A protein has these predicted regions:
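Short, hydrophobic secondary-structure boundary micro-motifs
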Residues: 92-95, 132, 183-185
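Hydrophobic alpha-helical connector segments
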Residues: 46, 57-86, 139, 143, ...
Length: 191
């Protein structure tokens, strides 16, 4: 039932999808659908909770903090975009349909906060010489926002997952390297 709902919501949107259409897609009766979920709103909430959990669990499960910082970044980005590429309907429901609804945007926001927290921890673990005022949380917000924009292109088929991953890795790694610490040697300057 939830798989059918994901497909229908991703194609038609929340407001245009009927319980009749979801029941037909799931090959069950409409009363059976109402028996399990009560209303379209409850069904959509169940879809969001399941899809967010699957997404966060999949990305978290592919993170290995024992890797080098660059390999950790590569692994996280490839995992993130590969999941979206393999679950396009889910992404469309989560980040297009759900975010356009006041009723459900808080659920997506909670999922995004979990990803931002994970990215902030990745940044902290991979930073050798952080500046005292480094705001890993704000950096994570920026990276997740950029990642969502790229993910939207992947989910619509406008971007190849491997090309998009390489672009994100190059962009993020160049920015994350930061400036050298004061203890590293600097080229001699002449006055």
């Amino acid at each position: 039932m939830l798989d059918a709902a994901v497909q229908m919501f991703s194609v038609n949107g929340y407001h245009e999808t009927s319980m009749d259409a979801i029941a037909a897609e799931a090959e069950i009766s409409k009363p059976m659908l109402y028996l399990y979920y009560g209303s379209k709103e409850e069904l959509f909430g169940a879809v969001l909770n399941r899809e967010l959990s699957r997404f966060v669990d999949a990305v978290r499960g592919d993170i290995d903090f024992t890797l080098s910082p660059k390999d950790l970044l590569r692994n996280a980005v490839v995992s993130y975009l590969s999941y979206i590429d393999a679950n396009r309907a889910s992404w469309i429901v989560l980040y297009t349909q759900a975010t356009s609804s006041q009723t459900f945007s808080h659920t997506v926001r909670e999922g995004r906060e979990k990803i931002v927290d994970l990215v902030a921890r990745l940044l902290q673990s991979g930073t050798r010489n952080p500046q005292p005022d480094t705001d890993f949380d704000m950096m994570a917000v920026a990276l997740v926002g950029a990642g969502e924009a790229v993910a939207n292109s992947v989910s619509t088929g406008d971007a190849d997952v491997h090309d998009a991953a390489q672009l994100m890795i190059n962009l993020f790694w160049g920015g994350l390297k930061g400036k050298p610490s004061d203890t590293q040697t600097h080229p001699a300057t002449t006055a």
